[in-house]
């Protein structure tokens, strides 16, 4: 007779085998089959069943089936709370928040992000801290709550700096995100300082030719464009486009946005000169 542990290993092995050969459109059926089998062989009060439901949610999410993923993550979260597993509850809250965020359910997503953040802080587990703070900042920015966005982005910078040091990609990402928020609130001096910081860190970490370096240059171009410093803006647009085009196609949305901004700047400079 197989033990529960052995059955679980067989289930997971079979799932992974199917995923490796399946197409994305087959993931929904794979997840359903896996979960149905898990419900048959595992006790309803088994923590492994909670794991199985979470894995099914992961499969749906990987296939872009966000509604189905949300259903699974909710179910798994409810069970993890019943078991009193703080790590699982924190992890599932974060997963559910991300899926709801992508589904446009910002209000509910914010609650689950904050729940996950609180649990990770209580456990003194900082592995997801900066990521969650950045996600909360982005969500609040999207809601137009710029005060909350600034608060979360500032905390993300502090956490990233404390965990990784001042010259780390995570610290640069947090500085970049806060800088973008300041562009939207037209606080261009703060935005300039943060994007310069992000650019300096990224050049140190990656060298001059890297997409994230190009992103920082493009953001600085927008700052100087908005401040009326057209010569600096032009230099950063040119640098950003040169770097981006080494890694992206011309029809890439980010490249097209930078190109459109650069074209608008050139038109403005022509008018100013005439």
Residue ranges and their predicted role:
Residues 9, 13-19, 47-62, 87-102, ...:
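Conserved alpha-helical positions within TPR/SEL1-like repeat arrays
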Residues 21, 40-44, 79-85, 121-125, ...:
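Short coil/turn linkers that connect adjacent helices within long alpha-helical scaffolds
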Residues 14, 26-41, 75-78:
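Amphipathic alpha-helices of TPR/Sel1-like and other helical repeat/solenoid scaffolds
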Residues 246-274:
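Terminal, low-structured helical/coil segments at or just beyond the last alpha-helical repeat
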Residues 1-9, 42:
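TPR-adjacent "capping" and linker segments in tetratricopeptide-repeat scaffold/adaptor proteins
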